[in-house]
Amino acid sequence: MEQFHATTIVCVRRGNRVALGGDGQVTLGNIVIKGTARKIRRLYHDKVLAGFAGATADAFTLQERFEAKLEKHQGHLMRAAVELTRDWRTDRVLRRLEAMLIVADAEHTLVLTGNGDVLEPEHGLAAIGSGGAYAQSAALALLRNTELPPETIVKQSLEIAGDLCIYTNQNHVIETLGG
């Protein structure tokens, strides 16, 4: 059976602001099943942003597990991420999940990979999913050459990814944190 897959999620941090956005397309093989999926969420009293890419059911499972760890550790992002990946590496069911998360709070942006890794990206920017490389390239160019706010960079990066990646559409959800 084919998996639901593909998306673009991008996170940009500039100054005391962070923006996380994603497109709304869900595909099954070469068929668009839904164009308005919401892959960006606010967690832990609206203090943490999370975006997911990968097999849809796996991504929801991973996000729910992360949210439980976040609650357990009173919103401490790094600790929750490390605890989740520890479980991910030791739990047989979790090890088979085909999904990735980008999570961000006021201080940190983290990528949680399908291998159970916790990565803190450089340049205040991260992108995952089938259009992630396009979005990351666009965002990096905008970060280096403009003074645009992070939410504008996320929007423009998603637009570029949507123009290039057949698994990414132009229906965007963008959330922000910070002043």
From Swiss-Prot:
Residues noted as binding Na(+) in the record, renumbered to the chain: 162, 165, 168
Compartment(s): Cytoplasm
CDD domains registered for this protein in UniProt: protease_HslV
Biological process, per Gene Ontology: proteolysis involved in protein catabolic process
Keywords: Allosteric enzyme, Cytoplasm, Hydrolase, Metal-binding, Protease, Sodium, Stress response, Threonine protease
Function in brief: Protease subunit of a proteasome-like degradation complex believed to be a general protein degrading machinery.
Family as reported in the entry's similarity comment: Belongs to the peptidase T1B family. HslV subfamily.
Name recorded for this polypeptide: ATP-dependent protease subunit HslV
Gene behind the chain: hslV
